[in-house]
Amino acid sequence: MPKRTDIKSVMVIGSGPIVIGQAAEFDYSGTQACRVLREEGIRVILVNSNPATIMTDPEMADATYIEPIATPILEQIIAKERPDALLPTLGGQTALNAAMALGEAGVLKKYNVELIGASLEAIDRGEDRELFKKVVDEAGAESARSDIAHSIEEVDKIAEKFGYPLVVRPSFTMGGLGSGIAHNEEELHRIAGAGIHYSPTDEVLIEEGIEGWKEFELELMRDRNDNVVVVCPIENVDPVGVHTGDSITVAPCFTLTDREYQKLRDIGIAIIRGVGVDTGGCNIQFAVHPDTGRIIVIEMNPRVSRSSALASKATGFPIAKIATKLALGYTLDEIRNDITQSTPASFEPTIDYVVTKVPRFAFEKFPGADPTLTTSMKSVGEAMALAGNFQESLGKAMRSIDKRHMGFNWDGEKPSAEEVAELLEAIHTPTEHRYLQLMRAIWGGATLEQVFAATKIDPWFLKQIFLINETAMTVREAETLTPRLLKKAKLAGLSDVQVAHLRGLGDEGENTIRELRWTYGLRPVYKTVDTCAAEFDAATPYYYSCYADETELRPREREAVIILGSGPNRIGQGIEFDYTCVHAVQELGKDYDTIMVNCNPETVSTDYDMSDRLYFEPLTFEDVLEIYEAEKKMGPVKGVIVQLGGQTPLSLAARLKAAGVPILGTTPESIDLAENRELFGEVLKKAEMNAPRYGTALSLEEAKEAAHRIGYPVLVRPSYVLGGRGMEIVYDDKQLNKYVDRALAEAKADTVVSGRLPSPLLIDKFLQDAIEIDVDALFDGEELYIGGIMEHVEEAGVHSGDAACTLPPSTLSDDQIRRLREGTYAIAKGCHVQGLINVQYAFMANTLYVIEANPRASRTVPFASKATGVALAKAAARIMAGETIADQRANGLLLPKGDGGDIHPGQQVAVKESVLPFKRFRTPVGKTVDILLGPEMRSTGEVMGFDRDFPHAFAKSQLAAYDGGLPTHGNVFISVNDTDKRQLPLIAVRLEELGFKLWATEGTASVLRRYGIESNIVDKISTRVDTDPEAPVEVHHAAGSVGKNVVQLIEEGKIDMILNTPNSRGSRSDGYSIRAAAIAADLPQFTTITEFQAALLAIEAVKHNDYQIMSIQEHSKQLFELERREF
């Protein structure tokens, strides 16, 4: 059945900012959808609030709106663009919920917009827990015994009926948000309360606990002729109880019998038909009892999901692309398989290799968070590996996580019987470190029966891990490493580093092991992902390594450039770096063969048809060097780009160069120069530029001496960090003592000598009340091109990745911008930059300070590119390949005159706001971790507000980042520190003028009273200074108060917005309870005066209700006209 001819234009809704449970996989699926629609001659209208996405590039759609995914905004875009259809199944839960809201508001009917990909009824049946249960029953399948609740009273009645443990699953949420396993009434009330709150329909499913069962997933697709294919079965190594996003998963399934698999297939096909998904795909999760084989259907997603991206990359079967074609009316047998070019999409993929996905976590960013893995997803990223067997695949995946000690290690003494007993107790609870603890227990002598009893991980997987340990012990104890034994180690997934450690050679022994391996002629070969287990030839070069006999690499003629990706998403290194890598691939592909190396299944860069060759491999020195050596034999290689993928590839630069690999762009020596305190200090001295006073310290005594010389407050951090890891603002000696004690405790015991750290702490003067600025620029050795000057909304002290910022800057003078331009030129010249550089500055009392410089792509490059209409990363890639800025001006990649540092009258304003994952991270007793922002980055994603002025743009950024955006009336609670009290009267008067009622603690209320401003007094909550914020609180009843504290008022829904600026770190726990309650209630809250002042401007803009809705194509045209007029 050919495609429908009545659909001429389609609106695609993206997934918005990167959050836990909904990450880069939806940029991948949305990008595929846009490409397919445009290939089919359909006009594409795209809406997404995330600027760090390839799908929001202007060439991906005819009209691209970087706007909040909110019903009023979506209606304005629909009214303007009049699409024939809406495709919501490729933007995750956000897009699905937005489509449902548009349907319920009557917008789709009003503008005659048809929903394609899945009907409202199908979405409802798949997402509504009660309706889905009926579908499962009608399919002849079984659900866990369950009931629906909309209140805690209903929850209690269900608990009486079923008993404990119970699983709580909210309707219409993603990543298991608000879900959990309750073992008693207290846990049930906490989890179910959160679930009802986070469900848009205030609905939770309470079901019998099935912890310990085996968990499986099926990815299915169905067309309008009722053809159904199972794209990929996936098995979770962790049993039911751990969210699939937090579990190690594998394909194909290893522990299902053929009969069980056929039964899952039959149930899955019946369910996709019963739900009514007839032009797209879905994901269905199952539980199988390990002893009886009883099958229970857990849930389904009637859309492209996180697992869809994994299944696509695992098999080479492009689910999002095919789902889009099905939504247009094609049938599976009419769609060609891109990889084979000779089989239709109705042929189910077959794989002859093993795929393993390992999650990456960020608990270190959230002190106090409960590290237990449950049904609510907590991982921030994932890595995938392909190999010839499970052991090799697991080893590759674990080292792909790019986290210290994430691979198995056998360092130190063999665990004692006492330690084994402790480890067996520890692995009862699933955590990030469970598999490392499990391996140590096995090394120490734990039996398979003991490990199975503790974890309920299927014995087949445990046997494989036992075999890895057995091989490791053979390597450790052998007299010599024979070719046979070394190959056995490689087949068991052991890296050269791991083998070196087993042989007692340490990290430095990696080169020795590699040289020995090469002497033996033992090198990996590269196999092709072909969707058909080699039954047909593959037309697309998509490779993975394994230790087999024959390589499938083919010779090439053009010179090649290898681009190293950023690996798994993490806080501090996310989708922004994949964006820059993809731009480099797109641009350099015009003149070179582009070779992409990455291990993240969520990203656009790992799409099989994005680059000329794709290697799905770990980003380690060993793996990258092997790829370079293999590619050299296939054709000429110009060099490797390490500047675009963040810290991961950057950290490999020096070693790759030393091994003879040409590094394109800024040299490793120049990268080190910018990160070396003394050398960079010389660059600044020569340029006559200021830096905050600083010192270094290896001990507490040295740290105190430096802090006293510099003067408190100081910013303390370890050497060489990404995302502000370990940074803290320290206000006194007592706090400094704690920081150094913690640093000593975290360092390896054998590296601490006489209370001295192995590497120095960096101590800087903290610039209080300074204006912080980010500058992104290009440099070719002679000419500088400013990509963007971004002014932070918060004062210095909040990590640049968490701070809101505006482009163009809103308060900087022409003279200040001139000084920033001159400073950036001097630094780029002094550091010998060839490509991108990011410099962070601060203005304090109009004195310019340089905070740091990074000679690489920064996380603000996509934002600056979208705000200025210039593809900075594409130009950077060409400069790294040897071209000049003048060349880029001539070829149209850069503006013919001027640059992104110029401000034009009438120019649109862009505001970037960060999105934080605090609601995901709770303490063991169920409270959210503290949200206070500081120098350590904690955000997972970002949004962009785009409008004619700062207030409107900031208002949009808040609407995009937080459900409902900013309130326009209601009650505001204010509690500020002593320093901020002098600014309080003006803020209070403005709030009154805007129609808000004020609530305050006694101290703040008394200040307001002196200025004739009345407020409602609430009781103060205080905790003992420097104690655990979980500690019991003392309630102080204030004279004239309403008899309640602010937490009680928040819980009663009587507070609409909060301003709570804390004092120094020691007393910051005072506001913890307030901030935790506000997070639980989804209230907008501000912890700095400057951001609250910005919010007041935005609230006034919201009240006018006159947002300007403009596509980025229209914006670029307007910007071009302004520049042409000016120059």
From Swiss-Prot:
Q: Pathway it belongs to?
A: Amino-acid biosynthesis; L-arginine biosynthesis; carbamoyl phosphate from bicarbonate: step 1/1; Pyrimidine metabolism; UMP biosynthesis via de novo pathway; (S)-dihydroorotate from bicarbonate: step 1/3
Q: Where does Mn(2+) 3 bind?
A: 840, 852
Instruction: Locate the residues binding ATP 1.
Output: 129, 169, 175-176, 208, 210, 215, 241-243, 285, 299
Residues the entry annotates as binding Mg(2+) 1: 285, 299
What GO molecular function annotation could you give as one example from this UniProt entry?
carbamoyl-phosphate synthase (ammonia) activity
Region annotated Allosteric domain sits at 963-1127
Supply the PROSITE patterns for this chain: ATP_GRASP, CPSASE_1, CPSASE_2, MGS
Could you say which residues bind Mn(2+) 4 here? 852, 854
- Example GO BP: 'de novo' UMP biosynthetic process
Region listing for Carboxyphosphate synthetic domain, in residue ranges: 1-402
Q: Which reaction(s) are listed as its catalytic activity?
A: hydrogencarbonate + L-glutamine + 2 ATP + H2O = carbamoyl phosphate + L-glutamate + 2 ADP + phosphate + 2 H(+)
Residues given in the record as Mn(2+) 1 binding sites: 285, 299
| Amino acids binding ATP 2 | 717, 765, 767, 772, 797-800, 840, 852
Sites binding Mg(2+) 2 sit at 299, 301
Please report the stretch or stretches of sequence annotated as the ATP-grasp domain.
133-328, 681-881
Q: What is its EC number?
A: 6.3.4.16, 6.3.5.5
Q: What cofactors does this protein use? A: Mg(2+); Mn(2+)
Would you indicate the residue range of the signal peptide? none
Write out the GO cellular component annotations.
Answer: cytoplasm
Q: What does this protein do?
A: Large subunit of the glutamine-dependent carbamoyl phosphate synthetase (CPSase). CPSase catalyzes the formation of carbamoyl phosphate from the ammonia moiety of glutamine, carbonate, and phosphate donated by ATP, constituting the first step of 2 biosynthetic pathways, one leading to arginine and/or urea and the other to pyrimidine nucleotides.
Q: Which family does it belong to?
A: Belongs to the CarB family.
Protein name from the UniProt record: Carbamoyl phosphate synthase large chain
What is the protein's species of origin? Bifidobacterium longum (strain NCC 2705)
